Regions:
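Nucleic-acid endonuclease domains
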Residues: 1-72, 87-281
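Short acidic loop-to-beta-strand element that houses the catalytic metal-binding Asp/Glu
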Residues: 69-82
Length: 281
């Protein structure tokens, strides 16, 4: 079974935290993102040491969807969670989400996801894992695996804000609008009517190192560390064999802690979560 618990076990077994080259382009920041995405896919598909041909087979077996564009998510585990891979520009700087707002869950009615994603398997809603990495040169120093329902609010919060902004733009007099999934698109802005304007949201979310600093701190003495945060209900939803295997791991650098996290939909209440950390020195 391919899931987050088994992926953490695999990382402990392999002790691997090196980034491969991934798909190389002319953009250095994009190259880092590609390498991180490859690492996360290899982690979940247990493919760190696989040949290219074997890796392709493992990917096909593990994932029902892998995206090559900018629409969310990056990956869907077959019969399991969705994965969205993001990189940290700094240990405490906001995480860039670009034009896609944060997700509590991934829903099939999200207008930003592709038809290929909607039709990859039978589903209506998926738990989503934000895999957020921080690297120094070619070495991954920190990887967060934080579930969206510990991190982001319900989709209605962001949708309502988007609708309010879009309607405000539409109320500007004497300009022409075109239907779009973005905040707005204005046409024919100049006397020749040849200039258009796309209005896009550029979303960010607070770095988990900052948001969850009450119970986790980055350990600069480590070569690598992974931090995973999920609700207790999510932890217990994994198959019994995965839970048994994970709880059978004996390693002095693996820590599993019960923590209370502010509810993203109601900060006055808390949710019971599992915090899993593993460090390589």
């Amino acid at each position: 079974m391919y899931n987050t618990l088994n992926s953490i076990i695999y990382l402990i077994e392999t002790q691997n935290f090196k980034l491969s080259k991934g798909k190389l382009g002319t953009n250095r920041i994009q190259n880092v993102g590609n390498a991180l995405e490859t690492f996360v896919k290899d982690l979940y598909a247990r493919s760190f040491s696989s040949t290219k041909k074997q890796k392709e087979k493992n990917y096909a077996k593990t994932f029902s969807f892998m995206d090559s564009s900018n629409s969310p998510p990056d990956v869907i585990i077959r019969g399991g969670d969705a994965l969205e891979v993001k990189k940290m520009e700094g240990l405490f700087s906001d995480v860039q989400l670009n034009s896609s707002y944060p997700k509590y869950k991934l829903r099939i009615d999200n207008p930003l996801i592709s038809n290929e994603c909607k039709n990859c398997e039978q589903w209506t809603e998926k738990d989503i894992v934000y895999a957020i990495g921080f690297n120094v040169k070619k070495s991954l120093r920190l990887l967060w695996l934080v579930y969206g329902d510990c991190y982001a609010s319900d989709i209605e919060i962001y949708d309502n804000l988007k609708i309010t902004i879009s309607e405000g733009i539409r109320n500007i007099p004497d300009i022409k609008f075109e239907e779009t999934n973005e905040l707005g698109k204005v046409k024919a802005l100049d006397p020749l009517e040849i200039t258009n304007l796309r209005i896009r949201g550029m979303w960010t979310i607070q770095n988990p190192n900052r948001l969850f600093s009450d119970f986790i701190n980055y350990d600069a003495s480590t070569k690598f560390q992974i931090i995973c945060l999920m609700r207790n209900t999510k932890y217990l939803s994994f198959d019994k064999e995965s839970i048994k295997s994970f709880e059978g791991v004996i390693d002095p650098n693996l820590f599993v802690t019960d923590v209370s996290v502010r509810d993203p939909n109601n900060p006055q209440s808390t949710i019971d979560c599992k915090l899993i950390t593993y460090k390589i020195f």
